[in-house]
């Protein structure tokens, strides 16, 4: 078996792996200019072998590339719409949460006012219905108020947040 590669072997390999159009473009672009050939005739051959649009513009993208770009643009537009929709939903949720916070954070109109006789009668109705005395109901309300204060108080002191360095 001979380890030498002949010119015929190279020609056979070349013919099997490179198409005629690619070889022609290579020769037009590089080979003739290196040999000092006529560059104008090379440009004419090159421009004749390139695909053109009906208006004469040279076509630089294949149909597959154009399709891919269109699909990517469609995907990008869909993502933008989804993002806008998510932002709107988030904004609506935030507005609803802010409204809820405003309603729940309104101060009492008359805090720590003594209980009136009408309220005591209402408490007596509750006592008959739920079997609690007025005193027990008031104590339970105080306990619930204290629990509320405990959980809504901020345990963090914000000043100074970071050590002051000179």
Curated annotation (Swiss-Prot):
Disruption phenotype: Inviable cell population. Degron-mediated knockdown leads to decreased cellular levels of Sm-class snRNPs and defects in spliceosome activity.
Gene Ontology biological-process entries: spliceosomal snRNP assembly
GO cellular component: cytosol; nucleus; SMN complex
Main location: cytoplasm
The UniProt record lists the keyword Disulfide bond: no
Keyword match Nucleus: yes
Organism domain of life: Eukaryota
Cellular location(s): Cytoplasm; Nucleus
Keywords from the named record: Cytoplasm, mRNA processing, mRNA splicing, Nucleus
Region spans: May interact with smn1: 1-58
Role of this protein: The SMN complex catalyzes the assembly of small nuclear ribonucleoproteins (snRNPs), the building blocks of the spliceosome, and thereby plays an important role in the splicing of cellular pre-mRNAs. Most spliceosomal snRNPs contain a common set of Sm proteins SNRPB, SNRPD1, SNRPD2, SNRPD3, SNRPE, SNRPF and SNRPG that assemble in a heptameric protein ring on the Sm site of the small nuclear RNA to form the core snRNP (Sm core).
Subunit record text: Part of the core SMN complex at least composed of smn1, yip11/gem2, gem6, gem7 and gem8. Interacts with smn1; the interaction is direct. Interacts with gem7; the interaction is direct.
Name of the protein in its database record: Uncharacterized protein C16H5.15
Gene this chain is encoded by: gem8
